[in-house]
Structure formats: C-alpha cells, structure tokens
Amino acid sequence: MRSSRYFLPVLKEAPSDAQIVSHQLMLRAGMIRQEAAGIYAWLPLGLRVLNKIEQIVREEMDRAGAIELLMPTIQLADLWRESGRYDDYGDEMLRITDRHKRELLFGPTAEEVVTDIFRASIKSYKDLPKNLYNIQWKFRDERRPRFGVMRGREFLMKDAYSFDLDADGARKSYNRMFVAYLNLFARMGLKAVPMRADTGPIGGDLSHEFIVLAETGESAVFCHKDLVEMPAPGPDLDWINGDLQPLVNQRTALYAATEEMHDEAAFNALPEGDRLSARGIEVGHIFSFGTKYSEPMKATVQGPDGQQVPVQMGSYGVGVSRLLGAIIEASHDEGGIIWPESVAPFDVGIVNMRQGDAACDAACETAYNALKAAGREVLYDDTDARGGAKFATMDLIGLPWQLIVGPKGIAEGVVEIKHRKTGERHTASLESVLDGLTKSKTT
C-alpha cells in the first residue's frame, strides 16, 4: 500500500478527552473515529489490526474444536424472558420495538439465542459434545463509556458456548477453552493471567477472567508472580482425547483473583516476594453454569438411559476490539505504538527520504515489489512530507520494521533498517536487508 493512496488521518495531538494511552494513540494513529459516546468508526489501519486479532481468535477456536456460526445482533425479547434474564439485565440492555410492536433487543450476549438454536437441532447425547462460537458486534448501554475501545458501548466479541451431557464433560469443555485462551493471548504478545472471578449476571459456579497487567487497568488484581511469566502450552496438544486438566491445574494452583474474589488472608500467606498486586485489563472471561439456561429453556437431550436431561453449558468470551487497547497499553513508548508482528497492520514501512530522486525512487520500488512478492504487507511512504514527519508517523503507527532509503545511503550502496521494538538501527545493502525481511515472521 502506498501512503499517497491510503487513508491514514493521523493527528499531532490526542483530543483532550482521551484519558488513557491506548485511546490517545488509536485516535492519533488514525485507527478509529468517535461517532457517538462509546461508538467508533473503525478506519483502515484499525480495521487491519482488528481483522488480524479476529483471525488469531478464530484459528485457536477452530484448533480447540469449536464450530463457528453467526448469530443475529437483534434478538427476541421473548427468548430472554424464557431464561428469566430480560428484566434482570438492567439498563445496559438496549431494548427495541419494531413496527409491529414486537419487543426486540440489541444483544449484549447470546446465551439465549444459541440455546434456542441448540434445542431445535440436537436431540441425543450421541451428538454431544458441541461448542459453537460467534464473532459478532455487541451493544451494552454503559452508563459512562470511557477509555476508547476499552469500555465502549458497541464492541466486537467472540463468544463460544459449550453443550455437554454431564458435569464431567462440561469441565473438559471448560478446560479446552481455558487452554485455548492461553495460546491465543500469547500469540498476540500478551501475558494474560487467568484469575478466579465472579460470575455476575451470566451465572454459574465456575469462572475465570484472563487479565493483562497494565497501570491503566480498570480493576485491582492479585496473583502469584510466577503466573505472569508462565509460558503458553502451545498448539501441539490432543484437543479431543487429551487430558488438559494438568495444564489448568498448573495455572490455578497458584493464587490469582480479581478484586471481587480476593481473599486477603490467603494472599498474605504467600511469601512476600511472590505476591503481586497490580491493575489489570480483562480480555477474556469464561464460565461454566450448568443448567442455568438449558432448564428454563428446555434444552434437553435423550441420555443413554432414554431419559430427557438438560444439557450442561458453558460460555467463553473474548473482547476482540478491546484487545487492541490492551495490546497498546502493554506495548508502547513515547513515540507511539509497538505492535507485535502477529497483529501489526503492516509488516514493514518503507520511508523514501527524498521522493522524486530517481535513485531513491528506484530503490524503494524495488523493495516494495520484492516484499509484496514475498507475501509481506508493506506501507510505502511515497509522499512529499519531510523526513522527520515520516519517521514520526512510522513510530506512531508502530510497524515492526522501517526500511529507510536516502540519497546518501544509496550513493554508498546501503539502506537503513530500524526495528521498532528495540529501536536498533543498522545499515546494509538493499539485497541483504530484503533477504532478512522476507524471512518468516516472529512475534
């Protein structure tokens, strides 16, 4: 992509009402534009990152055996009355009446819809287990939307729902999602700590939040320090028949709790050097809630004994759009965003220091075409802006690599390469730089 043809409305200063770093940088980098309180348009740069995060989530859900579908954003109020949540949900639910006076709502979550789909289709225990997931826009009418995409009213969410015959099967489904979450967050360069959490309006008796530690986190969290650096399990697991409980036990045996579930006495019993109290950002939340929805909505299957039994359910959410904010909060400097390569909007930014100079233009074109041919995503700044402005923009938008082409270097047969994360620069021939950049990505 050439900057001269791209839509990248960067700002020199963040609006005064942007309170946290991620909100400030997303606005300055031309990733989003606020259309109303808590509602944003996703501009091209932001959408590229959003799509990459969504794809990682999709790949890890598929790997863990979940099946994707797409549920409606507008839901029937009657379904929520069946579950008993319509009146309980409160003012966060946006309620709608259509021209026929039917009561509808803009879905804040989808337990009722997916249960309705399940009960119409699955009748026997032989068809279990099932895990259905959906990546869809949700709406919750927050009283005080703030912090940009971190606490907006409209947001993109992945929500998965498991259906099992009994509690043992439900726990296995829960464990699969628990481990899948560890992997998907690690692929985005995040250190997400699973913490025992309150179930809230979703319900159930087992729940974990996945928390990214950040000074701007909305809640206090408490955990054993070893959990922060514990590596992700990786993809090479037996997702169907393997026992994932030891992996879950490894993460849950050590103390970790959100503020609502915090046990100060148990936390203080840890050696002082092992205790970590911090602020955190919730990026995922998983629940096991038994028959909370299946019983009132009559989602039953015929068991091995021929009797009808309500299925055991769980739900598993990831804030896809919120993850952009969390990644920025965890990875930035005074110059701007530092994207992990796995989610960066482009892999490489080419900076032409003297647009219109024949030698510089030719070298940039060679690099641009070679990188694209190798499958790398490239943003080529071919504008007439000053060099300092080009550098500032590249640092702001956080591309992992910057390839800098100037007349002095070209005369000496070299170009400059800068690594955004470390700030390291070195010069080399264009051929050797391109050889390095066309190799496989790392996070």
From Swiss-Prot:
User: Where found?
Assistant: Cytoplasm
Q: Please name every pair of cysteines joined by a disulfide bond in this record.
A: none
The protein's annotated catalytic reaction(s) are: tRNA(Pro) + L-proline + ATP = L-prolyl-tRNA(Pro) + AMP + diphosphate
Q: Does the keyword Cytoplasm apply?
A: yes
Cite the GO molecular-function annotations of the record: ATP binding; proline-tRNA ligase activity
Q: What keywords are assigned to this protein?
A: Aminoacyl-tRNA synthetase, ATP-binding, Cytoplasm, Ligase, Nucleotide-binding, Protein biosynthesis
Pfam families in the record, alphabetically?
HGTP_anticodon, tRNA-synt_2b
Q: Which GO terms describe its biological process?
A: prolyl-tRNA aminoacylation
CDD domains cross-referenced by the UniProt entry: ProRS_anticodon_short, ProRS_core_prok
Q: What is its EC number?
A: 6.1.1.15
The identity of this protein, by name, is Proline--tRNA ligase
InterPro entries, per the entry: aa-tRNA-synt_IIb, aa-tRNA-synth_II, aa-tRNA-synth_II/BPL/LPL, Anticodon-bd, Anticodon-bd_dom_sf, Pro-tRNA-ligase_IIa, Pro-tRNA-synth_IIa_bac-type, Pro-tRNA_synthetase
One GO cellular component, as annotated? cytosol
Q: Which family does it belong to?
A: Belongs to the class-II aminoacyl-tRNA synthetase family. ProS type 2 subfamily.
Q: How does it assemble?
A: Homodimer.
Q: What does this protein do?
A: Catalyzes the attachment of proline to tRNA(Pro) in a two-step reaction: proline is first activated by ATP to form Pro-AMP and then transferred to the acceptor end of tRNA(Pro).
